[in-house]
């Protein structure tokens, strides 16, 4: 087998790969909380373990830490960047901020669900107040998701410029 040298990746390519991984992890947590699955229905939920909300809270914390590291990487990459990477690298910090807020809100939703499980075990549920609180948490998460999608569109525009620069 011959050893083919792989060209060194541009900083924007590394950052883009990292963003995909962060978003994949966040989306997995989102789906485990909100996506319909037959195992979540009665009586199946009595047999299969349910969503581990505490794990989601920890994962969101890790993603937020990684987002901060990515911001630092973007600052370093801007000094080495080629002109066609500029739009992408300028858009990434706003996207990481939106990802951070979205992770905070998803973490808050997971923590609320975990607290509700604890209250249900100890018979402390006050349904009317708890439903209003949950509704507010979901509304905040929905707003954060909307901001994340809008910031992601700008990142995609910047990434298309990077791809054109690489192919051009």
What are these regions (language model features)?
Residues 1-31:
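Cytosolic juxtamembrane helix and N-cap/initiation of the first transmembrane helix
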Residues 2, 161-168:
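Short acidic DE-rich linear segments
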Residues 9-20, 53-57, 86-99:
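Short, charge/polar-rich alpha-helical segments
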Residues 24-87, 124-159:
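Alpha-helical segments in soluble extracytoplasmic regions
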Residues 77-110:
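Extended amphipathic alpha-helical interaction segments
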Residues 107-132:
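Polar/charged, Q/E/K-enriched amphipathic alpha-helical segments with strong coiled-coil propensity
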